[in-house]
């Protein structure tokens, strides 16, 4: 059973490193494997309990960094494996059980935008891959467009497109909250620049950083 994040070196240092530490600190389970894919690493400060993959890529853009994790997941994990993918700018706030993890990852579970008329109603901040063909469909549809031509929101455009083919379950509040911390939630994510650049939100995340 697996949790995957992907980012560049800057985002790893600023966000992903603390996310991975927080997950392991609260959930040092032998059944849970943590994975991090880093694009263009430079002096990577690795954690012993994390499985790392890296790549060198000349055309790094925000859209590429947003979508590459789903391409990595399709290559790395077999369809029957239980996989959760998170935004790097998240933090773990409580323990979860193996049964809870299996339950949420058995289906394609996705973070839902709180606004009904949002351009992207399904958000990539929290995605579980289910145990069927979703991960392959997602990666293949992302790659129909050459990676250096990906535009902002490409990952969520494809996520929306596939909602007609795969039945998504809305990520429950018990697993993920966005911006404002909820004591019930396993993860808090700062999805969006509005939250990442506002101390009102970042200070909530900092409370869970493991020193």
Regions found by a protein language model. Name each.
Residues 1-59, 78-79, 188-201, 206-211:
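N-terminal anchoring/stem segment of glycosyltransferases
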Residues 9-16, 62-66, 117, 122, ...:
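Aromatic-acidic/polar surface patches that form glycan- and anion
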Residues 9-11, 39-42, 90-92, 114-116, ...:
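Short, solvent-exposed loop/turn segments at secondary-structure junctions
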Residues 22-26, 72, 155-162:
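Amphipathic alpha-helical segments that form well-ordered structural scaffolds
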Residues 41-49, 98-102, 180-182:
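Short loop/helix-cap segments at secondary-structure boundaries that form the rim of catalytic
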Residues 65-116:
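GT-A fold catalytic core of metal-dependent nucleotide-sugar glycosyltransferases
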Residues 106-126, 130-133:
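A short, conserved beta-to-alpha structural element at the edge of catalytic cores
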Residues 126-208:
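Catalytic core and acceptor-binding pocket of nucleotide-sugar-dependent glycosyltransferases
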């Amino acid at each position: 059973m697996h949790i995957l994040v992907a980012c560049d070196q800057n985002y790893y240092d600023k966000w992903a490193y603390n996310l991975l530490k927080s997950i392991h600190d609260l959930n040092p389970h032998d059944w849970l494997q943590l994975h991090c894919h880093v694009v263009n690493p430079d002096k990577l400060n690795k954690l012993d309990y994390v499985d790392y993959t890296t790549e060198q890529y000349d055309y790094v853009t925000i859209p590429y960094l947003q979508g590459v994790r789903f391409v990595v997941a399709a290559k790395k994990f077999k369809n029957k494996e239980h996989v959760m993918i998170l935004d790097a700018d998240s933090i773990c706030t409580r323990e979860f059980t193996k049964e809870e993890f299996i339950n949420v990852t058995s289906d394609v579970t996705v973070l839902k935008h709180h606004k009904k008329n949002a351009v992207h109603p399904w958000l990539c901040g929290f995605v579980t891959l289910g145990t069927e063909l979703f991960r392959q469909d997602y990666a293949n549809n992302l790659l129909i467009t050459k990676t250096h031509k990906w535009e902002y929101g490409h990952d969520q455009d494809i996520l929306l497109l596939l909602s007609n083919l795969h039945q998504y379950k809305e990520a429950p509040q018990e697993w993920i909250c966005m911006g404002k911390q909820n004591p019930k939630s396993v993860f808090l994510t700062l999805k969006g620049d509005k939250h990442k650049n506002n101390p009102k939100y970042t200070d909530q995340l900092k409370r869970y950083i493991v020193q």
